[in-house]
Amino acid sequence: LQTAREMAGQTGAHACVLTFDPHPSRVVPTGADYVEMIYPPELRAAKFAANGIECIFFKSFDRDFAALTPDEFAEFLKKKFPNLRGIVTGGNFLFGRKAAGNAQTLAQICRENGWKYAAVDGVESGGGRVSSTRLRGLLCAGDMAEYARLAGENYAAYGEVVGGKKLGRTIGFPTLNLPWSPQCKPPYGVYAVRLVDSKGKAFDGVANYGVEPSVGGLVEPLLETHLFATPNFGEGEKIKVEFLKFLRPEKKFPNLEPLTAQIKADCDEAKSVLSGK
């Protein structure tokens, strides 16, 4: 993104991003599992904007688009973006039917059309390339600290607080409930978290993400956050919940007594984790 911003400044253009939805793996069979996106389109757009990108274009990726040759893709760019000044991609960029085009192909297309081109090498850290694939693996493993180190920010859930069963309130641990089912899910379980409200105020807490096996179970997963300080908001509040550390997997308890004892232990552990942040 920095290279794109710099190129835009050099050419008097706007820094824009062209991205696809759904992910091409959901349209073009590869024999592998679908790629699960870390964030939905609206959050990706917000993150691009926060990093200085002025325009975000979402292109619907379908079979017709997947069938374009590299030259046909170039024609698409010329028609869609008649004032295009330059393109920035990763060095391992592939495009066109059956991935027929690569960074070298695109560089030639850019030369033929008078566009600038830059292929940016991937960043290496911790003995490997920083990539969305690597970040997804860290999320699935519950390694929130390494994810944050590589991504430059904590992984977070976003949404609006909804009403719940209010069971937590009866055992001394009221929660703020967020229905949340991203494509790329972290493990079900308990996390030390930091909740940020719509005004930007942060609250430390502990959260359970899962399907409530101890109290009847849920069809869709729920993120239930207990805050260590009483918030002045409730249902309807737009919040962000940052995952700081995975504490333990979700488990089923025979009754409320051991569940309550475990929640207290989880709170103590989360406070210990958060005090070191």
Predicted feature locations:
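A structural preference for short, hydrophobic beta-strand core positions in alpha/beta folds
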Residues: 17, 58, 119-120
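ATP-dependent adenylation/pyrophosphate-handling site
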Residues: 2-32
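Glycine-rich, Lys/Arg-enriched anion-binding loops that position phosphate/diphosphate groups
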Residues: 110-211
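Phosphate/ribose-recognition catalytic cores of enzymes acting on nucleotide-derived substrates
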Residues: 1, 164-277
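Residues at the starts of beta-strands that form the adenosine-phosphate
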Residues: 14-16, 85, 116
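N-terminal Rossmann-like or analogous alpha/beta NTP/dinucleotide-binding catalytic cores
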Residues: 22-113
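Residue-level signal for inorganic ion chemistry
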Residues: 48, 87, 147, 193, ...
